[in-house]
Amino acid sequence: MDCIFCKIIKNEIPSYTIYEDETVKCFLDAYPDSNGHMLIIPKKHYTNLDDIDIEVLNHIMKISKQMKKLLEERLHIDGLTLIQNNGLVQEVKHYHLHLKPHYQNEQEIMNIEEVYSKLKNN
C-alpha cells in the first residue's frame, strides 16, 4: 500500500508529532490553513468514515478534546473547526480528522518548527 499516512505512522516520512499512543498519531499539517492546524490519524489503516471502528472514532474524539485544550493553552486559539472529509473531497484515502484553529485576529502562518516548539515545550 502506498499510503502517505501509513508511512508517517511507520516513521518512514518525518512528521511534527504532537501526540502518539497505540491507537493514533497526531501531527501538524504540512500545509496548514492556520497556526496549529493538525491531523489525528488512526494507526490502523481505515479508508474513510464508513470503514473505521466506532471504538477508534471515540478514541480520536477523546484525543481531539485533549488537543483542543493544548491549542487553547499554548497558542491561545479563539475557536476550532473539526473537519473529516469523505469521497470526492478526501485527498488522502486514510481516515483523518483535521483540527483547524481559528483566531480573533487572523495571524500570518508561522514556521511549522515554531508552532511545534510552542506545542511541545513548556
Model-predicted regions and their roles:
Residues 1-122:
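HIT superfamily nucleotide-processing domains
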